[in-house]
Amino acid sequence: MTKYLLDTDICIFFIRGKYKVREKVYDIKSENCFVSEITLAELKYGAEKSDNYEKHAAEADYIARIFTVVPIIEHLDQFAKEKVRLQRAGTLIPDFDLLIGTTAVSGNFILVTNNEKHLSRIENIHIENWRKARFNGFLNGK
């Protein structure tokens, strides 16, 4: 079965009920969807700086409960190699994006993100953008 690594922006769309991301997760089953521990860290950071900490912290905890959280330790060699490659090419991307993206590559995930601009620079990455995707014959977008 195909495995999907959900980027932080997609998790936020899921939480907010935007772009039919929830429907897509339900269609493919949540057990086939994963999040990086970096995504979880970004969600917790967002909660911490929010004016509504309790709500956003609960949302981050919910994401951690319904999706398997993938540790980055096994993917750090891929991160280091890809960072050097991008640096030499003069096309670096933020480390958190690179950690999430290289986790997708080395873990054989399809990365689901709305951040195609940065993440498509990663070699051998497979990306889907569920914000732009078509489900049930209708173009998504709220």
Label each residue range with its predicted role.
Residues 7-8, 43, 79, 104, ...:
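Generic structural signal for small/hydrophobic residues in well-ordered secondary structure
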